[in-house]
C-alpha cells in the first residue's frame, strides 16, 4: 500500500479471501477494477473490508444453517421464501446436528427413533416445505442427464423404488441417520466417499433392468445424478478451494438431486444402500438412509416409495406423509453444502432445475444468472435460497393434483434434457471458445516437401512459399555468412540453399511464357458457322529498327490522303485495305513498342496475333529485343514473317541478318528453310507490296475464321482514362460481333457500349471479327490484356464484375501487407529508406511498363513504394494523397486536371512530368541513390620516403622527401617497411625547414612527427591518404 493505494491481491490476503471473491465484492460496490493486480484507494479498501466482514458474518450463519438442514438448497430456500418461518430453519438445523451424533451409532433402531423425533418436530414447524423439497428432488432428476454415466444408477434407483414399500416412520428415521453419517464421513475423507459411491451407483443399475428402462425414458439421462452425488462429497471438502469454479458446482448441484433419486431405488436392495451410504453412514437395513443423505443417497429411497404411488416417481404427487420424509432426507444435504462452496451453487442450480420441472420457461433463465454470478458464491446461495422456496411452493401446488405416472415420466424426461444442456452448455461455452482459439492458432500451413521456383524472390515471398517465418530464412542465411534483409531479392541458388537447410526440395520451373495463348476464343458451337476473317498482324522488333515507320509507310500508300485525322496514336491497332487476287481484303496491324520496358505489351501483342512481322534493321542486325520478340512469337505459336528494313542504307547487310536469324531457328526459304524474309525500305516504300502479299499468303494457309453471328469476345489491347470521354478501352474482337448497346464485361470493368470509334476516328455501330475499336461506356479502366465478353443478362455481368473486383482488391491488400517481422527487421536495420511514388500515365500499358522497369532496381536498402498507379490525368485527389504521404508524383505523357497544378503548388508536392521512359527511369534511380548513405572511400594523396631520422627529446622526427603527390597535415598515413605496414595513424606534425607547414608538395623535403610512432628507419615509405564520401549507385538487375 504505497501512497494510499492498495492492490486487490494484497487486500485478499489481508481478508483471507480469494481474489475472485474480492473482485465480486468490488463489482457489487461499483468499484472499477480490471484484475487482482489493480490498485484501489484506501477509502475504497475500507468499504471493501466492511463489506467483507458483513459477508463473512452472513456466510457463517448460512453455513450453520446449511449444516443443520438436511437438504442444502431446500432448507435454505424454504426458510428464505417462507420468511414468516425463519425460526423453523434454525430448529431444523439443530435437529440435523443431532443426527450427526447419531451417526456414530451404527444401530438402525436408535437412528430411526431419533429420526422420527426430528421428523415430527420438523413437520410441526414447517409441514409445507417438506413437500416442496420432495418435488425439487424430482426436477433434479431431469437435470442429472447432463452426465451420461450415471444413467444406470438412476435406472436402478427407480426399480428399488417400486419394490420398496416401507412405513413412513422407517423411511424418515433411516433418512436422518444417513444424512448425519454422510456429513461426518464426507468431512473427514471426501475423496473416498466420492470414489466408493461411483461403484455403488454402477452396481444398482444391474439389479433393476426392467424398471431402469422406464426410468431412463422418463428422466432422459438420470444416470448423471449418481455422479453428481459423488461430486458432492468432493465439493463439500473442496468448498473453499473450488469456489472459483462455477460450471462444476452447477453440475454438482444438478447431480445431487439425481443422487437422491438413485438412493430411493437402491432402498430395496440393501447392498446398494450400504455402498451409497459409505459417504453417509447407511445402516445395513433396506431402509432408505441413502435418501436422507443426499450425498449418500440413502434417505431419498425411503421417500421414493410413497412418491411412486401417487405420481410415478413421486416427483409431483407426494402425500403429506411423504413430504416430511423428503424434508428429513434433504436436511442431511445442507451439511455437505456447508463443507463445499461449490456444493451450495450446485444445490441452488438443482433447486432452479426443480422449478424448471414445474414450469419449463424458468429453466434457462435460472441457469444463466448462476453462471454470471460465478464468483459470488455466498450471494448466490442467498439468492438461490430465496428462489428455491418459490420452486418448492410451485412443486407443492403441482403435487396436490397427482399426475399419472406416464405423464410424470414424460415431464421428467423433457426437463432433464433441457436442464442438462444448460449446465453443460455453461461449462462448455468457455471451453469451446478456448478450443476455437487454440484451433485458430494451431491452423498452420504444413511445410511443403517440394516447391517450384521460376525466378528470384524476396525473403518474404520465399517465407510464404515455404510456410516458415521470414526471420527463420534470415537466420539460416546469416549462419551461412549472408546478411540479408526481409525485402532483399534472393537468386535461385540461394533459394535452393535455404530449401536444403529446411529439407525442402526446390525445383526450378521454366516461367510460363506471357505470350502463350490461354483462352480459345472459338467454341464448339461456333464450328458450324465459321467464316473467313482478316488476319491480325503484330509488328515487333528492336528499338529504332523502323517498325512504326514501316507501318506509316504502308498506311500512307493504302489510305486516301484526305482521310480525317489518321490514327489515334495510342490505339496501336489499325486496319489496311488491299487488293489481292482481284479481291479487296483487309489486314489489321498491331504496333508494339520496342523499348525493353514494354515486354508485357509485346507479349500481349503476340498472344492475340495471327502473324508476327519481325522488323530487323539491315545495318544493325539482331538485338536483344529482337530475340525477345522471336521468343514471344514462338511461345504464342504464330508464324513469323521477317522484314529486313533499311536496305537503302550504305551499311546494310541483309545476308548477315539472315545468318544471325538462323541461330534462333529462323531459316530463310531461299536457304531451304520455312521462314519468309522480305527486304524492304520503309522510307522509300520498296517491296511493301511484296510484304503484304506474303502476309496474306500466310493467312490463307492458316485458314483464319470466326463466327460473326454470336456475342463478341476478345482482348483489351490498351486502355486509358480520358478527361472528356471517361474510361476508354481499345478492344480487339476475336470472335463474334460487337454492337453499340451491348452489355460488356472486361476484367472487372462493367459497362454498356455507348459508342465505338475505329482507328480512323469514325464512329461505327458494328465491329466484326479481327477489328480493333475504341469503346466508351465502361465503369472503370480495364487492365491491358484482360479478356472481354458480351453478356445478354446485365445482372449476371454485374455479379461477375463484383466478384472479380473483390479478388483484385484482396490481391492488392495481400501484396501490400506489412508483417510484424518486417517492421522489426526495419527497426533493427535502422529506418528503411523508402521513396513513395504516385504514377499516372497516358495509357495502362505505359504504366505497366514503367512499374516493371522500376521493379528491376535493387531495393535492398531503399525501397520504392507505389502508392497509386493508374492511367489518366493528375487530379487534385492525387495531390492530396501525395501531400499526406510525402510522395512524388510522376506523370508520363499525361496532363493536369483543372486545379491540380495550383493545388500542387500550394501543397508543395513535387510533380515530375516525362514523355521518355529512359529519362523517367534514370531520374527515379538517381532519387533512390540519393537516399542511400554515402560510403567512405580512401583517396590517396601521395608517397614520401624517409631519408633521415632525428632524435628529439624522448621521440624522433623523420626527415622525408615527397616522391609523389603531396603531404597534408592531419591526414592519415600508412608506414611501410619492406612492403609491410608497420603503422597506421594520423600525421600530427609537418614542418618545412623550421616552420610548420599545412602541406608539402612533391619534390620537397620536410620533417614528419607522429605522436604515437617514433621507430622511424631510413628507407621507410609513408603513404598519405584521406577518407572522402562517395555517392553510391544502384545497378539495374537484368
Curated annotation (Swiss-Prot):
Compartment(s): Cytoplasm
NCBIfam families associated with the record: IF-2, small_GTP
Region (G4): 645-648
Organism: Trichormus variabilis (strain ATCC 29413 / PCC 7937)
Residue positions binding GTP: 541-548, 591-595, 645-648
Any GO molecular function: GTP binding
Region of interest called G5, as start-end residue ranges on this chain: 681-683
GO CC terms of this entry: cytosol
Residue ranges of every copy of the tr-type G domain listed in the record: 532-705
Keyword Protein biosynthesis tagged: yes
Family, similarity comment: Belongs to the TRAFAC class translation factor GTPase superfamily. Classic translation factor GTPase family. IF-2 subfamily.
G1 as annotated region, ranges: 541-548
Biased amino acid composition, Low complexity: 157-176, 407-423
Bias (Basic and acidic residues) ranges: 178-197, 226-243, 431-450
Biased segments, Polar residues type: 103-125
Main location: cytoplasm
Name by which UniProt lists this protein: Translation initiation factor IF-2
Pfam families in the cross-refs: EF-G_D2 (PF22042), GTP_EFTU (PF00009), IF-2 (PF11987), IF2_N (PF04760)
Stored InterPro entries: EF-G-like_DII, IF2_II, IF2_N, P-loop_NTPase, Small_GTP-bd, T_Tr_GTP-bd_dom, TF_IF2_bacterial-like, TIF_IF2
Keyword field contains GTP-binding: yes
Amino acid at each position: 500500500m504505497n501512497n494510499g493505494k492498495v492492490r486487490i491481491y494484497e487486500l485478499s490476503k489481508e481478508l483471507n479471501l480469494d481474489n475472485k471473491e474480492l473482485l465480486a465484492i468490488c463489482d457489487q460496490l461499483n468499484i472499477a477494477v480490471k484484475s487482482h493486480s489493480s490498485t484501489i484507494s484506501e477509502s475504497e479498501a475500507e468499504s471493501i473490508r466492511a463489506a467483507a466482514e458483513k459477508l463473512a458474518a452472513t456466510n457463517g450463519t448460512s453455513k450453520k444453517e446449511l449444516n443443520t438442514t438436511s437438504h442444502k438448497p431446500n432448507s435454505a430456500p424454504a426458510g428464505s421464501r417462507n420468511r414468516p418461518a425463519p425460526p423453523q430453519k434454525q430448529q431444523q438445523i439443530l435437529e440435523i446436528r443431532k443426527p450427526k451424533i447419531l451417526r456414530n451409532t451404527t444401530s438402525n433402531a436408535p437412528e430411526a427413533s431419533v429420526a422420527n423425533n426430528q421428523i415430527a418436530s420438523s413437520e410441526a414447524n414447517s409441514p409445507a416445505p417438506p413437500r416442496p423439497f420432495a418435488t425439487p428432488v424430482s426436477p433434479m432428476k431431469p437435470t442429472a442427464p447432463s452426465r451420461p454415466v450415471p444413467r444406470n444408477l438412476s435406472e436402478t434407483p427407480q426399480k428399488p423404488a417400486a419394490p420398496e414399500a416401507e412405513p413412513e416412520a422407517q423411511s424418515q428415521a433411516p433418512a436422518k441417520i444417513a444424512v448425519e453419517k454422510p456429513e461426518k464421513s464426507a468431512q473427514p475423507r471426501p475423496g473416498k466417499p466420492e470414489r466408493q459411491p461411483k461403484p455403488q451407483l454402477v452396481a444398482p443399475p444391474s439389479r433393476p433392468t426392467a424398471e431402469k428402462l422406464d426410468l431412463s425414458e422418463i428422466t432422459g439421462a438420470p444416470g448423471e445424478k449418481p455422479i453428481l452425488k459423488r461430486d458432492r462429497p468432493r465439493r463439500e471438502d473442496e468448498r473453499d478451494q473450488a469456489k472459483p469454479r462455477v460450471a462444476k458446482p452447477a453440475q454438482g448441484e444438478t447431480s445431487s438431486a439425481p443422487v437422491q433419486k438413485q438412493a430411493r431405488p437402491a432402498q430395496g436392495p440393501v447392498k446398494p444402500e450400504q455402498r451409497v451410504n459409505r459417504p453417509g453412514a447407511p445402516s445395513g437395513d433396506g431402509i432408505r438412509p441413502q435418501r436422507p443423505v443426499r450425498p449418500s443417497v440413502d434417505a431419498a429411497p425411503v421417500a421414493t416409495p410413497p412418491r411412486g404411488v401417487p405420481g410415478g416417481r413421486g416427483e409431483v404427487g407426494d402425500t403429506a406423509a411423504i413430504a416430511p420424509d423428503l424434508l428429513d432426507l434433504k436436511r442431511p444435504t445442507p451439511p455437505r453444502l456447508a463443507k463445499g462452496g461449490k456444493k451450495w451453487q450446485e444445490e441452488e442450480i438443482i433447486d432452479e432445475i426443480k422449478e424448471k420441472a414445474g414450469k419449463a420457461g424458468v429453466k434457462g433463465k435460472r441457469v444463466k444468472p448462476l453462471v454470471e454470478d460465478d464468483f459470488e458464491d455466498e450471494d448466490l446461495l442467498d439468492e438461490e435460497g430465496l428462489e428455491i422456496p418459490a420452486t418448492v411452493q410451485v412443486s407443492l401446488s403441482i403435487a396436490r393434483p397427482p399426475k399419472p405416472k406416464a405423464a410424470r415420466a414424460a415431464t421428467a424426461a423433457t426437463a432433464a434434457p433441457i436442464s442438462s444442456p444448460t449446465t453443460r452448455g455453461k461449462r462448455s461455452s468457455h471451453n469451446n471458445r478456448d478450443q476455437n482459439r487454440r484451433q485458430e492458432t494451431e491452423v498452420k500451413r504444413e511445410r511443403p516437401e517440394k516447391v517450384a521456383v521460376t525466378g528470384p524472390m524476396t525473403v518474404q515471398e520465399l517465407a510464404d512459399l515455404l510456410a516458415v517465418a521470414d526471420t527463420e530464412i534470415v537466420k539460416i542465411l546469416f549462419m551461412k555468412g549472408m546478411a540479408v534483409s526481409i525485402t532483399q531479392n534472393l537468386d535461385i541458388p540461394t533459394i535452393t540453399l535455404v530449401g536444403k537447410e529446411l529439407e525442402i526440395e526446390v525445383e526450378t520451373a521454366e516461367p510460363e511464357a506471357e505470350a502463350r495463348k490461354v483462352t480459345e476464343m472459338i467454341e464448339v458451337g461456333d464450328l458450324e458457322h465459321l467464316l473467313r476473317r482478316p488476319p491480325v498482324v503484330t509488328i515487333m522488333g528492336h528499338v529504332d529498327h523502323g517498325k512504326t515507320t514501316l507501318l506509316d509507310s504502308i498506311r500512307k500508300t493504302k489510305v486516301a490522303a484526305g482521310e480525317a485525322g489518321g490514327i489515334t496514336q495510342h490505339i496501336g491497332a489499325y486496319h489496311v485495305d488491299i487488293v489481292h487476287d482481284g479481291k479487296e481484303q483487309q489486314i489489321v496491324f498491331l504496333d508494339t513498342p520496342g523499348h525493353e520496358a514494354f515486354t508485357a505489351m509485346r507479349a500481349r501483342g503476340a498472344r492475340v496475333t495471327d502473324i508476327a512481322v519481325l522488323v530487323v534493321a539491315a545495318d544493325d542486325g539482331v538485338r536483344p529485343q529482337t530475340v525477345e520478340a522471336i521468343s514471344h512469337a514462338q511461345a504464342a505459336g504464330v508464324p513469323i514473317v521477317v522484314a529486313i528494313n533499311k536496305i537503302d542504307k550504305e551499311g546494310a547487310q541483309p545476308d548477315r541478318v539472315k545468318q544471325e536469324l538462323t541461330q534462333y531457328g529462323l531459316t530463310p526459304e531461299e536457304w531451304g528453310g520455312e521462314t519468309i524474309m522480305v527486304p524492304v525500305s520503309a522510307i522509300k516504300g520498296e517491296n511493301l507490296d511484296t510484304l503484304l502479299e506474303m502476309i496474306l499468303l500466310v493467312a490463307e494457309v492458316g485458314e483464319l475464321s470466326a463466327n460473326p453471328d454470336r456475342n463478341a469476345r476478345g482482348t483489351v489491347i490498351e486502355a486509358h482514362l480520358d478527361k472528356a470521354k471517361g474510361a476508354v478501352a481499345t478492344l480487339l474482337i476475336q470472335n463474334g460481333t460487337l454492337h453499340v448497346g451491348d452489355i460488356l464485361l472486361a476484367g472487372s470493368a462493367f459497362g454498356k457500349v455507348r459508342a465505338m470509334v475505329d482507328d480512323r476516328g469514325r464512329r461505327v455501330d458494328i465491329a466484326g471479327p479481327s477489328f480493333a475499336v475504341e469503346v466508351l461506356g465502361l465503369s472503370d479502366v480495364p487492365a491491358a490484356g484482360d479478356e472481354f465478353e458480351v453478356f445478354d443478362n446485365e445482372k449476371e455481368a454485374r455479379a461477375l464484375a463484383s466478384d472479380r473486383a473483390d479478388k483484385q482488391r484482396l490481391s492488392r491488400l495481400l501484396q501490400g501487407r506489412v508483417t510484424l517481422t518486417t517492421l522489426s527487421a526495419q527497426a533493427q536495420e535502422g529506418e528503411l529508406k523508402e521513396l513513395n511514388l504516385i504514377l499516372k500515365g497516358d495509357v495502362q500499358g505505359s504504366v505497366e511498363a514503367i512499374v516493371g522497369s522500376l521493379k528491376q532496381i535493387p531495393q535492398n536498402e531503399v525501397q520504392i513504394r507505389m502508392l497509386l498507379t493508374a492511367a489518366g490525368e493528375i487530379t487534385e485527389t492525387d495531390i492530396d494523397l501525395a501531400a499526406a504521404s510525402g510522395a512524388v508524383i510522376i506523370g508520363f505523357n499525361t496532363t493536369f486536371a483543372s486545379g491540380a497544378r495550383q493545388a500542387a503548388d500550394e501543397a508543395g508536392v513535387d510533380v515530375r512530368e516525362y514523355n521518355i521512359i529512359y529519362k523517367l527511369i534514370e531520374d527515379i534511380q538517381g532519387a533512390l541513390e540519393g537516399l542511400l548513405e554515402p560510403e567512405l572511400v580512401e583517396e590517396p594523396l601521395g608517397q614520401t620516403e624517409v631519408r633521415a631520422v632525428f632524435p628529439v627529446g624522448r621521440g624522433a622526427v623523420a626527415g622525408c622527401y615527397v616522391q609523389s603527390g603531396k603531404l597534408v597535415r592531419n591526414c592519415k598515413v600508412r608506414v611501410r617497411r619492406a612492403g609491410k605496414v608497420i603503422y597506421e595513424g594520423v600525421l600530427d606534425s609537418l614542418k618545412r625547414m623550421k616552420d610548420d607547414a599545412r602541406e608539402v608538395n612533391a619534390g620537397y623535403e620536410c620533417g614528419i612527427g607522429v605522436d604515437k610512432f617514433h621507430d622511424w628507419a631510413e628507407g621507410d615509405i609513408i603513404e598519405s591518404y584521406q577518407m572522402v564520401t562517395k555517392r553510391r549507385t544502384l545497378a539495374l538487375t537484368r
